[in-house]
Design a protein with these regions (language model features):
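General marker for long, soluble alpha-helical cores
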Residues: 5, 18-263
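Bacterial N-terminal signal peptides that target proteins for export
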Residues: 1-8
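Bacterial N-terminal signal peptides
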Residues: 10-16
Length: 263
């Protein structure tokens, strides 16, 4: 091998090693403490996870979610009635597996948790163009059941600006192709990820849009978000029209709400 060839090989090996180490870092197992209690509705459990060993990463925040009982294996609410019982509760999803193991005391299961990411899931996501899939993010994917089929459906629907971070918000606020298609049916182009999240956060729904349109308005998506933020509802518009204010633009209606001119 020539000297130049040896240098090139060394560089390639170093690059490969660096990529491998970064991948291993992202796929590290997370550990910490956990607890499970019954939620008030009787169909869910309150799960709390608090990571350990993260002092050097600046990300020691705890996570608390309400999980459907069907999400668990090895656990039921009846276990919380057995004082001193040992429980191994697991949540398995495409992104990985969370295991919370511990004992029951006073209706509460407390112990230690591990989260093990699934390398095959990460490989698929990389192939689909998603990066920065660190273990903490994959843990959230597991808790919110973010899977390949759902992600692919968003891509197929033409949702722009998707990344590994905003997928979590899209999932939390129940953005799916049914919602996207309902907007398309009203003549709106498919919004990007950020706007879809904003629409869902503000509870913009097709039925209310139809009511607003029936009153002579053709709101943009941004205007729909503003209308929800400032409570410019069909009822509010009717009240303004009853006062003889029939030619108010959406912008004027929003200003009336902002400055409380209708009171």
């Amino acid at each position: 091998m020539t000297k130049t060839g040896g240098v090139v090989l060394s560089v390639l090996l170093a690059a490969f090693t660096g990529l491998f180490l970064r991948a291993e870092e992202k796929l590290r197992t997370l550990t910490g403490s956990c607890s499970i209690t019954a939620s008030s509705n009787g169909t869910e459990a309150d799960l709390r996870l608090e990571r350990s060993g993260c002092e050097d990463r600046g990300n020691c925040s705890s996570t608390q979610t309400q999980e459907q009982l069907s999400a668990f294996s090895g656990f039921s609410l009846a276990d919380l009635q057995h004082e001193g019982a040992h429980v191994d509760a697991r949540i398995r999803a495409e992104a990985g597996t969370i295991t919370c193991s511990g004992g029951v005391h006073d209706g509460r299961m407390s112990g230690a948790f591990t989260f093990v990411p699934d390398p095959a899931f990460v490989d698929r996501m990389l192939q689909m163009g998603f990066h920065d899939l660190e273990a903490e993010k994959l843990e959230a994917y597991t808790l919110f059941d973010i899977g390949i089929a759902w992600v692919h459906s968003l891509q197929a629907a033409g949702v722009g600006s998707l990344d590994s971070g905003n997928l979590i918000a899209l999932r939390i606020f129940h953005v799916d192709t049914d919602y996207i298609h309902s907007l398309n049916a009203l003549g709106y182009a498919t919004p990007d990820a950020g706007k879809l999240t904003a629409l869902r956060v503000q509870h913009v729904n097709p039925e209310e849009v139809k009511q607003v349109r029936a009153m002579g308005y053709q709101p943009t998506l941004d205007e729909l978000i503003q209308m929800r933020i400032f409570k410019v509802t069909p009822d509010f518009i009717h009240r303004m029209q009853a006062r003889g204010l029939n030619d108010l633009t959406i912008s004027k209606l929003v200003q009336i709400r902002i400055f409380q001119l209708a009171d």
